[in-house]
Amino acid sequence: MNIAVAGIGYVGLSCAVLLSTHHSVRSFDITQSRVDLINAGKSPIRDVEIEDALAAGTRINASTDPQEAFTGADWVVIATPTNYDPDKNYFDTSSVEQVLRQVQTINPDATIVVKSTVPVGYVEGLTSEFPKLSILFSPEFLREGNALRDNLHPSRVVVGF
C-alpha cells in the first residue's frame, strides 16, 4: 500500500514513521529544510523515538512537490498546521483545504484521513465542498516529544466521517 502524509510536524512525522514500518510512505511538506532532514534520516522535531527510527532507516521519502507525493497514493493523511486565530475564534484550515485541492487534482481516488486539528463538523462541510473525495477524520491525541509512543499506544481511538 502506498501512503502519502502531508505535513511533517509532530503529527505527520509520527504517522509517517509508524506507517513506514509496513508501507511505503511519501511525505509532503512546503518547508525544504524539513524535507532535506527527513531524506537524510534526521528528524526536524525533538522526539527521541522518531529520531532513532529515522536514523535506523525507514521507508519514507519526503518532497516539496505535491505531484510526487500524492501520485499513486492509496491513502493521503493530512496533518498540516491549523493554528487557532483568537481574533476570528477559529482555526486556520487553509492548509488542509490546499492539500485537498491538490489531491483532488492529482489523485482523486485516494482515501483521505484528516489528522489536523479542526472545528467540530468541519469534515462534514468538506464532503459537500469536495463531493468526489473520500474523506475521513481521525483526531490526534499526541504529546510533543512523545508523538511516536502516543501513536503506538493510544489512550483512545476515534474515527469518523
What is each stretch, according to the model?
Residues 76-78, 114, 159:
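Redox-cofactor binding/interface segments in oxidoreductases and associated redox assembly factors
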Residues 8:
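Glycine-rich Rossmann-fold phosphate-binding loop(s) that bind the pyrophosphate
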Residues 3-5, 112, 157:
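Conserved hydrophobic helix-helix packing surfaces used for dimerization/oligomerization
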Residues 117, 148-161:
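Short beta-strand and adjoining strand-loop segment in the mid-core
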Residues 19:
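Aromatic pocket-lining residues of Rossmann-like dinucleotide-binding sites
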Residues 12-13:
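N-terminal Rossmann-fold NAD(P) dinucleotide-binding loop
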Residues 84-146:
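Rossmann-like NAD(P)(H) cofactor-binding subdomain of soluble oxidoreductases
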